[in-house]
Amino acid sequence: MNAVKVYSTGTCPICVKAKAFLDKRGIGYDEVRIDLDREAMKEFAVVTKGARTVPQIVVDGACIGGFTELTELDMDGGLDHLQP
């Protein structure tokens, strides 16, 4: 299990962008497709405290928000410990 989890759907272009961002930095992540699994949708609602947009990204157990928040966390050095 990775320290990063990306909640996504198959039709979300920003989800693709977020995953590519993590891939480029060599940061492993688990993807949870909420459009394919009802249980994943329930988990998404709880973990993200009712967020209605994807992607939603969890780092070290804390939901940080979407792609913008991911890039801000990276700029602040908050992802450094996850990079190889």
Enumerate the language-model features and the residues they cover.
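Thioredoxin-like thiol-disulfide oxidoreductase module
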Residues: 34-51, 82
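Non-catalytic, surface beta->alpha helical segment in thiol-disulfide oxidoreductase systems
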Residues: 59-84
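Structural micro-motif
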Residues: 49-58, 68
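Short alpha-helical
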Residues: 13, 39, 52, 65
